[in-house]
Amino acid sequence: MKIIYAFLLIAVVAFMGSGIMAESLAEAIADKPGQAKKIGIFDRITELVNWLVNH
């Protein structure tokens, strides 16, 4: 049971981290400062995987 909770915790942290990274990326590629482009959930997952591979 503890293992299941550990996996769920890791999944939630990874999902939250991908959201934060995607927002930072959206700000970086925005046309104007403070105007972030919308990024979908699959783009967030892709960015998370790319970030994990690069680090």
UniProtKB/Swiss-Prot annotation:
Localization (cell): Secreted
Propeptide: 23-29
Signal sequence extent: 1-22
Main subcellular localisation: secreted
Keywords: Neurotoxin, Secreted, Signal, Toxin
Record has Secreted as a keyword: yes
A GO term for molecular function: toxin activity
Tissue specificity remark: Expressed by the venom gland.
GO CC annotation: extracellular region
Family to which the UniProt record says this protein belongs: Belongs to the formicidae venom clade 4 family.
Protein task: Probable neurotoxin.
The protein, known as: Myrmicitoxin(1)-Pr6b
